[in-house]
Every structure is written in C-alpha cells, then in structure tokens.
Amino acid sequence: MFGLSVNHAYAGPGIFINDGTDDGCIWTFDKEDYSPIGDYFGNTAPADKDSAGRNSPASVKYHIPSIQQLGGAATLKCLSKDRDTQTDRVLFYGNSKEQGSISLTLGGELFVNNGNLGLGGGTDTKAMRIGSMATLTGPSGLRSLAIGAGEIATVASGDDAIAIGTAAQAAHVGSIALGLQSTTELPSLVKDVTINGIKLSAFAGSNPASVLSIGNDTLKRSITNVGAGRVSKDSTDAVNGRQLFAVSEQAASGWSLTVNGMDKSRVGPGDTVDLSNSDGNLVLSKKGKDVTFNLASDLKVTSLVAGNTFLDTNGLVITGGPSMTVSGIDAGQLKISHVADGAVTVTSTDAVNGSQLHRVAHTIAEHLGGDAHVNADGSVIGPQYTVQKKRYKTIYDAFGGVDENLANINDILHDIESGGGIKYFHANSIGADSRALGTNSIAVGSDSVASGEGSISVGNGAQASAHGSVALGENAAAPDANSVALGAGSKTSEVVATKGTTINGQYYDFAGDAPSGTVSVGDKGAERTITNVAAGRISVESTDAVNGSQLNAVNQAIENLAAGVTENDKFSVKYDRHSDGTKKNSMTLQGWDSATPVVLANVADGVHKNDAVNVSQLKAGLSTTLGEAKAYTDQTALQTLDQANAYTDKKFGKLNEDIVATRIEARQAAAIGLAAASLRYDDRPGKISAAIGGGFWRGEGAVALGLGHTSEDQRMRSNLSAATSGGNWGMGAGFSYTFN
C-alpha cells in the first residue's frame, strides 16, 4: 500500500511518499529549500548541510527531520541519488539539486496498485481516461472524459463527451453516459406532443444540444434525491417525484363546473362534459375540437329587458312610455303618427288612422240619419228620430219606441199563430199546399214552392228556387239568386252588370254596376209597363228608376243644348289639341287678355278623386285635417271605435231593415184592411157572389178578392177572401148564423 502524510512537525510545502516497503522514504525538497520532508520517527534532526541550517532548535522550522532520521545514508533508502537508481516507483523531487522541473511530472501514464488504477491522456485529443487498461486503451473523442473499471472499456468517443461507469458509452458530441453500461443516442427534436388528443407545444429546451444517459435500451435506472426544479414556461430543470405527484394530484382533482357560482360539481380526468340547451335558444355545434355557440333564429324567452323596456309573455312595457300587453295597448299619452290605412272588414284587426276614423264618424252619422252629422272638429251631432209620431234623441230611446211597436206587432202575430187570424185577411184554395223547403223561406198560395234559402214564394204555382229570391203572382218564377219576379207569369233571368256606355266617343261609368239580383215584371212576349213611377234621384251615384217625365226633360234639355251649341262653342272651354287635331290631356283658359290668369268662379264641390275642388272644399279639408289631428286618440281608442263601428254598422243595418220592413208591413196591413173592407157581397137569399176591392195607404197599395154566400132562409152567411200587398198574401174567412 502507499500512503500520503504530512508530518505533524510542520505542514510545509513538501510531500513525502512511503510505499510501505522501505524503512526510509522517497522525499523531495520544496521550491525554496526550506526542508526535506519524509518519514519522521520523533527525534530532532541535527543541523547539518542537508537541512540547510534550518533544523536548529532556534529555527522557526524546527523539528523538521534530517536525512538520517528519514532512513540514514547507510540504508540508501532516502538518498537524493535514489532517483537515478529507482525503477519501481515514481520519484518526486524539487529543484534544490537542479534535477527536475519545478512541477510534478508523472510521465505518459500513471499506474497505481500494479495497474488496477490508471490515468492516461492523449496529446492530440486533449482527452482524459481514468480506470482499467481497457478504458485507457479505448477510443476517445476530442476533449472527452472516460472513467471506468473492468474488462469492458468505458468509452467517451464523442467530442466533448463524458462516460463514467463500467462499459459506459458516450458516443455522441457533448453526450454524457453515467453508470454501468449506459449508452447515449442522438438528441431528439421535440417541438410538440399529443396526449389524449390534446396537442402540447412551445416547450423550453425543445432543441437539445446533446443527451445525458443513465442506462440503455434494457437497463434502466432511477434518479433519486433530485432537488425540485423550477416550474415555469422557460424552465429546463429536471423535476422530482414530489413535483409530479403534485401535478398528478391537481390533474386527478380535475376542475369544477358551476352555473352562476352555484351547483358546483367535479369534472375529473376522463369525465365527459355534455353541452346542451333545453329551451332551444342556443344552437350548439361541434366540429373537431371547436364548439360553437349561436343564438337560435327564433328565440323563446320568458322575459327580456333592454334599458327601460321590459318584454315578457304579458307583452311589452316601456317605462314612462307606451305598453302593449295582453290586457291591451296603452300609448302612454303619446301620439302614434304615420299610421297607414288599415283594412276595414268584418275580420280585420288592423289599426286605423285619423282619416279613417273621420270617415267612420261620417259614415255613422249618415247611417244614424235623423240629421246626425260630423262637425269640422270631428265631433258628431246626434240624431233625432221619429217613431210613430214620437221624437227620440238617442238610439236607446228610439229602440224603446221601436220595441214598443214591435211588441204590438208580436201580439198580432201571436194571435195569428194561435188561430185568431187577422181581420180582413183570408185565403181560399182547394189546390195543393204550399211548401217552404229552403231555410228561412216563406211559401203562400196553392202549390207555391219556396225552395231557395231565404226565398219568398206567393201566389198560385209561384216558384222561388234561388237564394234570397222572391216570386209574387200566379206562376211567377224566380230561379236567380236575390232576384224578384212580380206579377203573374213573370220570370227572372241571369243578372247582367252594365258598367257604363259610350256616347259620342265618350265613355260614361254607371252607378250600380255590380247588381246582386234582378227584378222582372213579365217574361219574353208578356212584358208589362211600370206606371206611376215616382221621379228618381238624378246624380252620379243615383240608382233610382226614372219616369217618362224625367226622360222628357232630358230630351228638352238636349234640344235646348243643341240649339245653343253653335253660340256656346265660341265661348266654350276646350281641350288643347295636338297638331293632328287629337285632344291633349290639358286645357288652357284664356280671357280677353292672354297674359292675365283666368279665375274659375262658382266651382261646384268635387266628388270623385280626380275632381277639382273649390276654395270652400280646400278650407274644409284644412279644417278637417286640423280636426282629425285634435281627435286622434291612442291605439286602444282606435280599436274600440273600430269595434264600435262594426257593431254599430251591424246593429243599425239590422235596425234599418227592421224599421223599413215594419213600416212597409204596417202600411201594407193598412192598405189590406182598406181593400178587404171595400169587398161587397150580394145579400139576397141563395146568392153566391164574388167581390174585388182595393186599398191604398201612404204609398202602399193592396188588392182583395172574395166570395160570399147567403142561405135561402137568410139565416146563414159565409165569405172567403184573399188580399195581397207588397208581395205578401193574406187570407180570411167569415161565417155568421142568425138564431132568431
């Protein structure tokens, strides 16, 4: 064995090596010749030349051993010349004898313990190899280090490589192989990695310069006692098990899922989170790893708030403004402008504007009659009605009067239904019974048939077969809807609409160009004249019949016009004409001075949309516009008035029909009474007589027919009569017997 020790006398700048086989030692001086250093046996060395005079008791370097004390000259074990004869060991010498450099030189290789430990290097590679002979003789890279024992070489063949451990192989530039049989590989470029479908990238140190290996393909090692590495996006430190455990704990804990901070639930690794929407307002879609959230085209929400606006299932409410809820519409005392004309029909729910409301008021006033009218400011002056010579100022009161009269009529009808009959109204026939086959139809007379819905058939053999048709008279026929056949043998034909006619190249439109039915007073080859026709109204909208005197007046007017055409042509207003003589759609008025505008005076009120208006109409229009603006109400009022209009139209239309029908029937009844009262029979015994009579009351006429019989003894008298008025027939019978 060899050992290295420093004498306790002085730990100076020299070393002494004893291999354990010599009694003396191998020694050397230090650079400044302070003293020799060697084995020391405890005796103080004398001051002689070999101790350089520094071994005296007074010297600060006292107790430094002498050559003799280190073995003595007799043994020749510690002599300076030993270096010339020594072959089995390395000698360390200073420069006191001028035989060696000032540094330690170990030669090309160092072998310790008979070669079991060696140290070698290469001058060319500047590498170092420490270990067994196999390691020392193995290949080496530039500036590499190989440390290893055993029969298998530890090789650091890569430049700047390090191999430590038996058979360790560091074959790549800058690589490190640590441990038994560890081998290195080329470094791998790791830009990213995919774990469970998740791509991780942007790694620090993703492009390593070399590798450190602590094993091989089959031999693996654990690295223990690793300090915790820095954990950051730029860190390239190794991490230990505790750090990975913390990551594992965190990963295993997953993450928490809450909704509005409530209902917390854990989502762990491997769990699936399903995204869904129950109300359909969100449309969720997934493409690859992307989840898209979109609003549905039709949102379904319970309520919605936007600023001061609130919308829910009850409707829309604007704070301090309008609202539209299931309870109705509240305009919030604000005006609604630019409302287009809404449809005004039985089924319409459109909003209407002020102009429509004004027209409604005007229409209501017209239908109310009784001098009702609309003022310029839109207000309505109520009507006054006269029912049976009594005046009423309200519809309610008028209805009361009508109801009173209807009650009287109902009493009369009740008497008829009860078999009491009507005075002076009788019927006599031995023919087939009448048949009212249509819904709400009336049939009167022998073999009279009313088969159309709402039809009326009166007279022997009369036929009313179409909807709303009326056949009045013997064998009268009304096969066309809403048509009337008047008189015996009369027959209606298909309705023909006459839109207008052209006179002298000018086309004229006719009113009543959409007739709903026709009235026939005869048939082909059996025509009738209509006499006693009252003069009808003559206007652009009139549909009244005109009589002969009116046509005569027209003829006279035409003759007068023809006489004055020539003279009037000089002063007439004419159309401008094209160069070919055809008329233009313009007129140029010119008086005595062509430079002075012409004033049109006494201009009538325009009627149609293209008629000229006069100043009065213009002022009225402006006044109406202002009145409409003042009368404009909110949406609720409009709807209410719209409903009131429809209701009023319906009720007043029905009322008008009932009143007219009641008035006509009352007058007809009076006429029938007069006609029946005028019948006279022969009172002579055994006589059968026939009578005819007529009656007229307030524009309604009636005809009565009757048969009378007086017995031979004049005790028994009987009669049978029938009367007609306005297409309605009545029958009556009477019988008397004298007992004494």
From Swiss-Prot:
Function: Binds to hyaluronic acid and epithelial cells, and is required for full virulence in the mouse model.
Biological process annotations from GO: cell adhesion; protein transport
Domain notes: The signal peptide, cleaved at the inner membrane, guides the autotransporter protein to the periplasmic space. Then, insertion of the C-terminal translocator domain in the outer membrane forms a hydrophilic pore for the translocation of the passenger domain to the bacterial cell surface.
S-S bonds: none
Region (Outer membrane translocation of the passenger domain): 648-686
Pfam name, any one: YadA_head
Region feature (Surface exposed passenger domain): 12-647
Name of the protein this chain belongs to: Autotransporter adhesin BtaE
Lineage: Bacteria, Pseudomonadati, Pseudomonadota, Alphaproteobacteria, Hyphomicrobiales
Similarity comment text for this entry: Belongs to the autotransporter-2 (AT-2) (TC 1.B.40) family.
Phenotype caused by lack of the gene: Deletion mutant exhibits a reduction in the adhesion to HeLa and A549 epithelial cells compared with the wild-type strain. Shows an attenuated phenotype in the mouse model.
Location of the region described as Translocator domain in the Swiss-Prot/TrEMBL record: 687-740
Membrane spanning residue stretches: 686-696, 700-710, 719-725, 728-739
Stretch forming the signal peptide: 1-11
